[in-house]
């Protein structure tokens, strides 16, 4: 499908990945990738479970050989989030991964050989109802495209994507997700913009080979932030040379910055100044760690000045502003009570828990109401 303007994420074609629907709504799904050898089932499952606990919603594993492919079924049985299997050239590995219960495969159909091999993979994916992700990478574009454009360009990347899409569409396969990764931020932004104009399949966002924890976080936030701000993107991975749990943490913070994470708590904290009379930095870090696993849209403020604090964080749901020997606990900018400095963090945590429980109870009530209405209908 050729469109003339950017396809906003809410207008992309919905594609199912396990129990999740990718595209067709405002939720951008967080993805990461394991660093373990996939054939080591114990290590891989342990890492996936750590990622899921941190907020990862889809996980990808490498499948370079038959040992890895044979492990997919065992891994799948022991994890709680959808599993994507990364295949490069061997279609037989794709077939084995699909048979093992993969929720999605990442494969470029133009790279796996003769048409009958592609047909076999497409038929297996169709039979199981799983999508295929086409992964275009500026560093591995086809020779003919590099010869045409001279070097990796956004137009060349889109042409590569359309080539692989057409192979699948010609086989009447449309459960497709596409990524347009580059390590150059400007190239990635341009490629995703052009892709969003060229087709309406969901886009998986990423800046590849972005670097170490600090540099990669900055680079990914710069590139993916620009793309997200244009309404582009349905799934996202922050690629870091670090523990993959850090990728998930950065992704959550980035989505929260754009108001795209409906199930995450957010921290507001001031940059500190000479007026501060509490150890604000350590308090902010402690609170940030505490709220990292709370799946509720709560804004929490930690501020060092009792004079300006409540006013500066009027939009926060709950917060503390420290002063000498005490803190002010406030909700929605209004002071609730004074608390001693030594207990103010614990008091704040209690209030956070109350708000989280209220949110969870509201969700359960909404679910019950919806179930009742469905039964009546």
UniProtKB/Swiss-Prot annotation:
It comes from the Bacteria. GO terms for biological process: isopentenyl diphosphate biosynthetic process, methylerythritol 4-phosphate pathway; terpenoid biosynthetic process. Its cofactor is [4Fe-4S] cluster. Converts 2C-methyl-D-erythritol 2,4-cyclodiphosphate (ME-2,4cPP) into 1-hydroxy-2-methyl-2-(E)-butenyl 4-diphosphate. Its EC number is 1.17.7.3. [4Fe-4S] cluster binds at residues 270, 273, 305, 312. Disulfide bonds: none annotated. Gene3D superfamilies: Dihydropteroate synthase-like, Sulfite Reductase Hemoprotein, domain 1. It is an enzyme of class 1 (oxidoreductase). GO terms for molecular function: 4 iron, 4 sulfur cluster binding; 4-hydroxy-3-methylbut-2-en-1-yl diphosphate synthase activity (ferredoxin); 4-hydroxy-3-methylbut-2-enyl-diphosphate synthase activity (flavodoxin); iron ion binding. Pathway: Isoprenoid biosynthesis; isopentenyl diphosphate biosynthesis via DXP pathway; isopentenyl diphosphate from 1-deoxy-D-xylulose 5-phosphate: step 5/6. NCBIfam families: ispG_gcpE, PRK00366.1. It catalyses: (2E)-4-hydroxy-3-methylbut-2-enyl diphosphate + oxidized [flavodoxin] + H2O + 2 H(+) = 2-C-methyl-D-erythritol 2,4-cyclic diphosphate + reduced [flavodoxin]. This is 4-hydroxy-3-methylbut-2-en-1-yl diphosphate synthase (flavodoxin). Keywords: 4Fe-4S, Iron, Iron-sulfur, Isoprene biosynthesis, Metal-binding, Oxidoreductase. Binds 1 [4Fe-4S] cluster. Belongs to the IspG family. It holds the Pfam family GcpE. The keyword Glycoprotein does not apply.
């Amino acid at each position: 499908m050729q469109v003339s303007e950017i396809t906003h994420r809410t207008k992309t074609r919905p594609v199912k990945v396990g129990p999740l629907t990718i595209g067709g709504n405002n939720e951008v799904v967080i993805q990461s990738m394991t660093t373990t050898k996939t054939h080591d089932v114990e290590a891989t499952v342990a890492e996936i479970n750590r990622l899921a606990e941190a907020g990862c919603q889809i996980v990808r594993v490498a499948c370079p050989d038959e040992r890895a492919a044979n492990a997919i079924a065992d891994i799948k049985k022991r994890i709680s989030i959808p599993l994507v299997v990364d295949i490069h050239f061997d279609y037989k590995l794709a077939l084995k991964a699909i048979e093992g219960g993969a929720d999605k495969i990442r494969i470029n159909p133009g790279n796996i050989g003769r048409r009958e091999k592609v047909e076999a993979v497409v038929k297996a994916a169709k039979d199981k109802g799983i999508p295929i992700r086409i992964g275009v990478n500026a560093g591995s574009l086809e020779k003919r495209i590099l010869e045409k454009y001279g070097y990796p360009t956004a137009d060349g990347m889109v042409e590569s994507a359309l080539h692989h899409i057409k192979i699948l569409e010609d086989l009447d396969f449309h459960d497709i997700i596409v990524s347009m990764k580059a390590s150059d931020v400007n190239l990635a932004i341009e490629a995703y913009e052009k892709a969003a104009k060229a087709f309406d399949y969901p886009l998986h966002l990423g800046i590849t080979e972005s670097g170490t924890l600090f540099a990669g976080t900055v680079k990914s936030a710069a590139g993916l932030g620009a793309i997200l701000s244009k309404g582009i993107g349905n799934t996202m991975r922050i690629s870091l040379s670090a523990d993959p749990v850090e990728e998930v943490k950065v992704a959550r913070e980035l989505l929260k910055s754009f108001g795209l994470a409906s199930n995450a708590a957010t921290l507001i904290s001031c940059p500190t100044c000479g007026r501060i009379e509490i150890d604000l930095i350590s308090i902010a870090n402690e609170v940030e760690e505490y709220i990292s696993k709370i799946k509720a849209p709560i804004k929490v403020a930690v501020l060092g000045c009792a004079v300006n604090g409540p006013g500066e964080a009027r939009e926060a749901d709950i917060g503390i502003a420290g002063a000498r020997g005490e803190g002010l606990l406030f909700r929605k900018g209004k002071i609730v009570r004074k608390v001693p400095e030594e207990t103010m963090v614990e008091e704040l945590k209690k209030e956070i828990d109350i708000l989280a429980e209220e949110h969870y109870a509201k969700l359960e009530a909404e679910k019950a109401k919806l179930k009742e209405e469905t039964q009546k209908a």
